[in-house]
Design a protein with these regions (language model features):
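Zn2+-dependent metallopeptidase catalytic core
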Residues: 18-78, 106, 113, 117-120, ...
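Sec/Tat-exported extracytoplasmic proteins
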Residues: 33-41, 119-132, 158-162, 199-203, ...
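Surface-exposed patches in mature extracellular/periplasmic domains of secreted proteins
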Residues: 38-53, 131-137, 169-170, 207-214
């Protein structure tokens, strides 16, 4: 495949020639996301590249972690694995491919089309948080898995995906075992944003940004206790499960 390059003020996009219009829309979304993020945190000052893949196989070949994460992900969240961030690039599926992965339930297409913004938010938070990827190194893989709910959750919340995740959350609550708190690596992509949504609703957006960018504790439950002070972790878990149920029922 011959790569074509498109540019905007702060981003470049490398893509197949047939994805030229999609690339323009991705760049516009990324510029909007950068402007919105700048109100909450310091966005990357260097140019970030969006590498737009025309198939899941191409994405997996470029980012071998993607099929691993796909295998771990719960069935309800698997379709929303749309890419992966590196230190200076985000690799993602072309919007036309994302659209083909959407289910018929409300919000599925919208959530998928916001994937570039979510991946960029993950990259931005990973730059500020030394424990989160990118980059993902073998030595830090266990910590990355333990804190996957933070990495995926901050991207979902900051990009505005969380409201669109409601039908998928409802499906997840009906399928499989009871979700853990914080969400496990298999549920991080779908349920991680709900933790940030709850935190922002209770304490404001800056509290959620602090969770995304501050080094987490070795024990995720200690990270949660620090993020939600003033009540027991058991009580916070109950509030979170009630919040999940509200999201699922909306």
């Amino acid at each position: 495949m011959a790569w074509v390059e498109s540019r905007s003020s702060h981003f470049t996009a490398r893509h197949d020639d047939r994805d030229g219009q999609d690339a323009v829309e991705v760049l516009e979304l990324l510029e909007e996301s950068r402007e919105e993020l700048s109100a909450l945190l310091e966005p990357p000052q260097d140019e970030v590249a969006a590498v737009i893949h025309s198939s899941f196989a191409g994405l997996a070949l470029s980012q071998p972690i993607v099929p691993v994460v796909s295998a771990i992900a719960s069935p309800a969240s698997r379709r929303y694995l749309a890419g992966w961030p590196s230190q200076s690039e985000i690799h993602l599926l072309a919007p036309r491919v994302l659209a083909s992965r959407a289910s018929s339930v409300p919000g599925s297409l919208e959530m998928l089309l916001l994937a570039p913004a979510a991946l960029y938010a993950q990259l931005a938070c990973g730059r500020l948080n030394p424990v989160l990827p990118p980059p993902l190194r073998p030595r830090s893989a266990l910590a990355a898995a333990r804190n996957a709910w933070i990495a995926a959750g901050c991207g979902q919340w900051l990009s505005g995906q969380t409201p669109h995740a409601r039908p998928a959350i409802a499906r997840r609550l009906k399928e499989g075992p009871r979700p853990s708190f914080p969400p496990s690596a298999s549920d991080a992509l779908l349920l991680g944003g709900s933790v940030f949504d709850l935190l922002a609703g209770e304490q404001g957006p800056q509290a959620a940004v602090k969770l995304a960018t501050g080094p987490p504790a070795d024990d995720p439950r200690k990270t949660l206790a620090r993020a939600f002070p003033g009540r027991s972790l058991t009580d916070t878990e109950g509030v979170w499960r009630a919040h999940l149920a509200r999201l699922a029922g909306s």
